[in-house]
Amino acid sequence: MKILGVDPGSRITGFGLIEANKLKFNYLSSGCIRTQGTLPERITTIFVEIEQIIQKYQPDVVVIERAFMRPDRPNPDAAIKLGHARGAIISAAGSNHRLMVEYSPNQIKKTVVGKGHAAKEQVSFMVQELLKLNKAPQADAADALAGAICHAYHCL
């Protein structure tokens, strides 16, 4: 099963693609989509780039991190922009007839690291270990790969 994980952001969106077979993982690709310009330009870039990745790799499922707002630091403007980025990703998956699944950040961390409030460095380290990578991926790409790994653990 090919799984595309996506860590949404209006400025940086991470993506990571793995192939999973009976909890054996094969790393295929990962990276970060860096956007510039107005909000509509950034959202369009996310949609176009995710759509190109879907069309190139033909994943069976797209995994996206569920949005949340920290109660100790509410930022409605950031949440709305994140919602726009998520909408672009969901639209790209839908327009290419891909199954889309969501996991909470804590669920992803608990599955990959073993604790729901793991630090980004711990997630990156475990992604590197599980995928047998020579070096740790960029933080946003590592989060996306962690989402893909999480789905593999939950569905295989």
Describe every region a protein language model picked out:
Residues M1-L156:
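Phosphate- and other anionic-substrate recognition elements at nucleic-acid/protein interfaces
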